[in-house]
A protein has these predicted regions:
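Conserved beta-strand/loop scaffold segments within soluble protein domains that form the structured core
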Residues: 1-172, 176-179, 193-194
């Protein structure tokens, strides 16, 4: 696992009891993380990839398992990020949250596609997939495609995506309290990515 620290600014694995993990390189130059969270296990993973990263995360959740995965990136200049996530619920009562938050400045690009899968006869599942993007330049670009394949009726699954800039009223609020625009913007970005 030594190479993980070299690939990312931050990659934190917490609460790994009852988790089987395999990490592999993809042919396309990206990294694939596969996690199987066993019965009643819990996993929390935070990724803060550096520029020009391709990351795919696949979660498989057994009965009563829980997982939370966050991908947080700040693209500058011509950074190019590609993220793929798959949340596979194969056990009753499993829960997952995937949250992708990106800030894009200059000509940075983000391509995110995620999917939640729940097969027939699996019940009590709670799954969320959230993608929030902050564009700070007219040249920055975000493509987002959240998806769900839900084949069971007794589940609570949500997905959504948002793309926008910093609310001018927020910057005005900070300005009225004596904070310069650049400092206010940096504070807003830090809060957005936390």
């Amino acid at each position: 696992m030594q190479w993980v620290a070299e690939q990312f600014e931050s990659c934190t694995f917490l609460e790994e009891e009852n988790v089987i993990r395999s990490v592999e390189f993809e042919e396309a130059g990206g990294i694939l993380f596969c996690f199987c969270v066993q019965s009643k296990g819990f996993l929390r993973v935070d990724f803060r990839p550096l520029e020009n990263q391709k990351i795919a995360v696949q979660l498989t959740l057994e009965e009563g398992a829980e997982a939370m995965v966050r991908l947080l990136c700040h693209g500058r200049e011509r950074s190019d990020f590609t993220f793929r996530t798959l949340q596979r619920h194969v056990g009753n009562g499993s829960k997952s949250v995937v949250e992708v938050r990106c800030v894009c400045e200059d000509e940075a690009r983000v391509d995110y596609r995620g999917k939640i899968e729940v097969p027939e006869h699996i019940t009590g599942v709670k799954a969320e997939q959230k993608n929030k993007n902050l564009l700070l330049s007219t040249e920055a670009y975000v493509y987002t495609e959240p998806a769900m394949d839900i084949r069971s009726k007794d589940v609570e699954c949500f997905h959504g995506a948002a793309v926008g800039g910093i609310d001018p009223e927020v910057l005005r609020y900070f300005s009225m309290r004596g904070m310069e625009k650049l400092s206010a913007q940096e504070l807003y970005i830090a809060g957005f990515l936390n």
